[in-house]
């Protein structure tokens, strides 16, 4: 089994902290997940990238990338294609500096076809709370517009909106 120090030291900007910091307890891990959901729902690639180490390594589906610049480029492409993106994340498990989440997001393409994308992510954080490793597996399901479950205005999910488990997803 890999230890929490399974990767080499990561490069971060001096003094750059992203609380809550590891090691995570249930409350800290749940806060970290909601903060990640909120920033991804901003659909601002540069803002999202600040939560990752300078040399963060990602696997997103079958695409591999490394570093904040690559993250910004990837997210710019993603949100050019995935329109009206709305995301909900849910804590699945945590241990020390690692968090596992499940998520679902809804979006439409430029032809008007709606999708719900389901996935799981494994995250590993450095001591400053920046994510240094992200592994995401995602599947897209075409849905009818009438089957959408996420109808809040674009941006942060309202606090009173149901989560994944509450929605039966």
How would you label these PLM feature ranges?
Residues 2-24, 73-169:
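A beta-strand edge to alpha-helix "cap/lid" segment located at domain peripheries
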Residues 27-31, 45-99:
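A solvent-exposed, acidic/Ser-Thr-rich amphipathic alpha-helical stretch
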């Amino acid at each position: 089994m890999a230890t929490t120090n399974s990767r080499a030291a990561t490069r971060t900007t001096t003094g750059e902290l992203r609380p809550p910091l590891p090691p995570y307890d249930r409350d800290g891990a749940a806060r970290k997940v909601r903060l990640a959901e909120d920033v991804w729902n901003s659909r601002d690639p540069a803002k999202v990238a600040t939560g990752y180490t300078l040399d963060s390594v990602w696997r997103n589906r079958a695409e591999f990338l490394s570093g904040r610049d690559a993250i910004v480029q990837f997210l710019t492409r993603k949100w050019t294609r995935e329109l009206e993106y709305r995301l909900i994340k849910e804590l699945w498990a945590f241990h020390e500096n690692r968090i596992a989440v499940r998520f679902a997001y809804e979006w439409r393409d430029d032809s008007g076809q709606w999708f719900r994308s389901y996935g799981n992510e494994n995250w590993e954080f450095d001591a400053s709370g920046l994510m240094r490793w992200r592994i995401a597996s995602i599947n897209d399901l075409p849905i009818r517009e009438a089957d959408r479950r996420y109808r809040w205005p674009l941006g942060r999910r309202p606090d009173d909106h149901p989560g994944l488990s509450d929605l039966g997803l």
